[in-house]
Curated annotation (Swiss-Prot):
Organism: Streptococcus agalactiae serotype Ia (strain ATCC 27591 / A909 / CDC SS700)
Pfam families: IPPT
Swiss-Prot/TrEMBL cofactor(s): Mg(2+)
Biological process annotations from GO: tRNA modification
UniProt-annotated stretches for the region Interaction with substrate tRNA: 36-39
NCBIfam families according to UniProt: miaA
Name of the gene encoding the protein in the UniProt record: miaA
Job description of the protein: Catalyzes the transfer of a dimethylallyl group onto the adenine at position 37 in tRNAs that read codons beginning with uridine, leading to the formation of N6-(dimethylallyl)adenosine (i(6)A).
UniProt xrefs under InterPro entries: Dimethylallyltransferase, IPT, P-loop_NTPase
The family this protein is said to belong to: Belongs to the IPP transferase family.
EC number: 2.5.1.75
Catalytic activity as recorded in UniProt: adenosine(37) in tRNA + dimethylallyl diphosphate = N(6)-dimethylallyladenosine(37) in tRNA + diphosphate
Protein name: tRNA dimethylallyltransferase
The UniProt record lists the keyword tRNA processing: yes
Origin: domain of life: Bacteria
Amino acid sequence: MRKIKLIAVVGPTAVGKTALGIELAKTFNGEIISGDSQQVYQKLDIGTAKASKEEQEQAYHHLIDVREVNENYSVYDFVKEAKVAIDTIISKGKIPIIVGGTGLYLQSLFEGYHLGGEVNQETLMAYREKLESLSDEDLFEKLTEQSIVIPQVNRRRAIRALELAKFGNDLQNSESPYDVLLIGLNDDRQVLYDRINRRVDLMIDNGLLDEAKWLYDNYPSVQASRGIGYKELFPYFSKQIPLEEAVDKLKQNTRRFAKRQLTWFRNRMNVEFIMVGEENYQQKIKRKVSDFLSSK
């Protein structure tokens, strides 16, 4: 069976994934699937760095604004809905282009491990999400508790070993139906951090405080409120800290998040990054995509 060709644009926040995804969609007759766990929420546009209405008019976006703010969203939901979006795009004769920085979502979509049946698949992904939330120390402690020995201790092997221990023969390793071209974007660290700081300032100027205050007043305890861009501002609204301190915390958390994203994509998905500061980097990427799409 011939595999479905997918393009995936990944990398840290603020590196330029949205702009590149739109450019590739326009060049190669594609549609975009958002691979971001926060952009699924309606009414949360600024803090999630959602593609603007103008950007969405340039290329159709799937999996944006598909949940109410008070609804939960899981890796299982993403995989199920992304597969539907892929099939829809393919049926139009177009190329699916996945753009996002939520590594667990993308990895779970691309790999072939699964359990038989809908309910079991949801169980597997919920368990994986739980393991991913653990620190390295707690994760490796679970290996020790269950007397699991793996040849090389790293997070990916540890999580796979724990999944096998829990689900045993029910965990099937089927071949992925997708042939994925991973395009990783990165930039000089200080340049990226400066861009993050400027973007936070721009978000504040564009109305992030009003957006976050609405969330704080109406849905302070939902899953969406725990995302970066909102939780840092809640202590300001409750008069615990001044605005300047809250904004500094938001910048700091975003920079740390970018670092974690880079680590994830390097270590878990073996992404080779292209530096956006390189001359003609978009042209190089377009040639790479063209070669990929024309190959059998």
